[in-house]
Each structure stands twice: as structure tokens, then as C-alpha cells.
């Protein structure tokens, strides 16, 4: 198990999709995270970076797609996603630059 010192190294990017936008209205945010990070590290990173209170973290490991190249077949890298639910009294995270909906 590797230790990740900086919380910003754990959170790689927000996931931008219709499903993630729908979940934002319910207080759940989706992030691409470092594949070696665990739920506790993700919770601490979100609380430190955004200054909010996290109630739960769900993670999903996704296999990279198999893609055809001119040299045969290749594979995109595997990713890990984290669905982070905030407490009801936390302020919303402004990761997309403005209010949703």
C-alpha cells in the first residue's frame, strides 16, 4: 500500500456526464481518483480540498476499453471512480463553476 501525501494527488478530476449531473442535485459528487487510494483517503481528501462534511464514499473500479490500433489491439488504462455523498448541512461543491439546473 503506497501512501499518498497530498490530498490533491488523490482526486484526479470530476466526472462529467448526465448521470453525475443528476446525482449532484442529490448531494452526491463523482470523481476520478487515484487507483491505489482507499475510501478513507478519498473522504479525507474531499473534506480538506473542498471544506465540506462527507457522509459516505462508494468506489467503482472500471476496466479500460480494448481499442484497435494499427499495431494490433491496445487497452486504455483502468480507472477508479468515487461517488462521494455530502451531509445535508454541507454547502454544495462548485466544481463546474456555477449552480446546477
From Swiss-Prot:
InterPro entries: Nucleotide-bd_a/b_plait_sf, Ribosomal_uL23-like, Ribosomal_uL23/eL15/eS24_sf. GO terms for molecular function: rRNA binding; structural constituent of ribosome. The keyword Cell inner membrane does not apply. SUPFAM superfamilies: Ribosomal proteins S24e, L23 and L15e (SSF54189). GO terms for biological process: translation. HAMAP family: Ribosomal_uL23_B. Part of the 50S ribosomal subunit. Contacts protein L29, and trigger factor when it is bound to the ribosome. Belongs to the universal ribosomal protein uL23 family. PANTHER family: 60S RIBOSOMAL PROTEIN L23A (PTHR11620). This is Large ribosomal subunit protein uL23. The lineage of its organism: Bacteria, Bacillati, Actinomycetota, Actinomycetes, Mycobacteriales.
